[in-house]
Amino acid sequence: MNLISIPALADNYIWLLHNDDRRCLVVDPGDATPVLQALADHRLTPVAVLLTHHHQDHVGGVSELLQHFPVPVYGPEETRSKGATQIVNEGDSLTLLDHTFSIMALPGHTLGHIGFYSAPWLFCGDTVFSAGSGRLFEGTPRQMYESFQKVNQLSSATLICAAHEYTLSNLNFAAALLPQDSVITDYQRKIKELRLKNQPSMPTKLHLERQINLFLRCHDVNLQNKLNVHPAPSEEWRVFAALREKKDHF
């Protein structure tokens, strides 16, 4: 299987996952035009569309795409009015292109947000970004923290296929908060160079995110000290909440 990232809109990524028979899955098509172009360029034929949540920059291209390729559209209940024809929930599984995808409930960015996981790929929409977290438009910090914990239980080799190119701005925030963290600052320099060449920073591996993503480090004493939040281990979501609020105003 081969993974293709399609830059779209301002800073979105639409994902194509295809096999050797040139059949593919399309994930979160916020705009049909670049998808249709990529399908033509790579001589691919979609067999399904996967939607992680209902926001327009993830579903805006569904209708036009279906005019060209009338395929099933899998998504959470909140995407039913956005073109989803097959509603999927936590615990469901899909077999597509001979791979089984597990559905993960990942509330936070939206209440019905889901992820599609088939090792090594996790299509997680606007939940986990490289070095960052999605904004909380509908859910609570605790919900998003728990979604991050769920993702963190996956294999360290998991490829995080997030839907936006926010990596450098996330690293700028992390480096401002923990300037002595050389893993973060070294990666910040690497991504600056990458983005100057207009190359994508996605997908990212979970083992790297465990080092550079502060939202996966709520147990970190240095981070807790910086935020002046010292919760009991059972309430580490409070660190996540303080971190998310600080990022919102960065």
Curated annotation (Swiss-Prot):
Zn(2+) 1 binds at H53, H55, H109, D126. Its cofactor is Zn(2+). Keywords: Hydrolase, Metal-binding, Zinc. It comes from the Bacteria. It catalyses: an S-(2-hydroxyacyl)glutathione + H2O = a 2-hydroxy carboxylate + glutathione + H(+). One of its GO terms (molecular function) is metal ion binding. Binds 2 Zn(2+) ions per subunit. CDD domains: hydroxyacylglutathione_hydrolase_MBL-fold. Its EC number is 3.1.2.6. SMART domains: Lactamase_B. GO terms for biological process: methylglyoxal catabolic process to D-lactate via S-lactoyl-glutathione. It is an enzyme of class 3 (hydrolase). Pfam families: HAGH_C (PF16123), Lactamase_B (PF00753). Pathway: Secondary metabolite metabolism; methylglyoxal degradation; (R)-lactate from methylglyoxal: step 2/2. Zn(2+) 2 binds at D57, H58, D126, H164. Thiolesterase that catalyzes the hydrolysis of S-D-lactoyl-glutathione to form glutathione and D-lactic acid. Monomer. Belongs to the metallo-beta-lactamase superfamily. Glyoxalase II family. This is Hydroxyacylglutathione hydrolase. The gene is gloB.
